[in-house]
């Protein structure tokens, strides 16, 4: 009975958070953000869900949310593929938040290497991905130091940049910029420059949102989990 109750609570939490994600992903962002990575408001909760639900459940809740959100606010069939970046970001954020650093490091290393081994990347402004480089450097630093005091900030930043890097991996190494959208290298240069300014603003907004929202939301979720455990113990006696 206890195991069933715990599973029921888990499914309920995933469904609840997925509904929130779907709402945020179905609301268009402000026009000034269109040159950034995210076209909706899903970026606000990507790392937050990874922290609260954990890497796996955070991934699932965001994945369900963006699939529903993209169906409501349709951005093109190809965007469903790029939407996977959001749950990946939640997973990486959740792992790092729980001090699991090996997979995030491998993720950043492999995807960055793939990017620089792709010929078109040599034609794009090197500084256009400055925020991704910074996230990788921060990730390497926290592997040899403790970061409890700034854990929330660091994990939020790295999780969002993991989302961005995954989308870049789809766009450049997998060459969907040409296969899906027919972009030329010249067009990609413009996109890279614009994204270098807009996307970090979105990241900053998400960091501020997470720092404010995480503590109260975590308390509510923890209380829900505790109540579920208490209820299951009561039922089993």
Describe every region a protein language model picked out.
Residues 1-237:
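Loop-helix junctions at membrane interfaces
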């Amino acid at each position: 009975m206890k195991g069933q109750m715990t599973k029921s609570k888990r499914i309920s939490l995933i469904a609840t958070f997925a509904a929130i994600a779907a709402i945020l992903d179905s609301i268009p962002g402000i026009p000034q953000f269109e040159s950034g990575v995210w076209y909706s408001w899903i970026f606000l909760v990507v790392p937050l869900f990874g922290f609260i639900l954990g890497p796996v459940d955070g991934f699932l809740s965001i994945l369900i949310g963006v699939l529903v959100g993209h169906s409501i606010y349709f951005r093109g069939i190809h965007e469903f593929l790029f939407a996977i970046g959001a749950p990946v970001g939640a997973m990486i954020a959740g792992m790092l938040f729980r001090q699991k650093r090996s997979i995030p490091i491998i993720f950043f290393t492999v995807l960055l290497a793939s990017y620089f081994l792709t010929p078109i990347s040599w034609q794009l402004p090197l500084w256009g991905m400055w925020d991704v480089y910074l996230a990788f450097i921060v990730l390497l630093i926290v592997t040899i130091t403790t970061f409890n005091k700034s854990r929330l900030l660091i994990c939020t930043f790295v999780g969002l940049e993991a989302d961005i890097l995954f989308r870049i991996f789809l766009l450049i190494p997998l060459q969907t910029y040409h296969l899906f959208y027919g972009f030329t290298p010249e067009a990609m240069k413009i996109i890279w420059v614009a994204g270098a300014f807009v996307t970090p603003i979105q990241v900053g907004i998400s960091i501020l949102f997470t720092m404010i929202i995480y503590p109260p939301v975590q308390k509510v979720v923890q209380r829900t989990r505790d109540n579920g455990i208490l209820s299951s113990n009561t039922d089993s006696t």
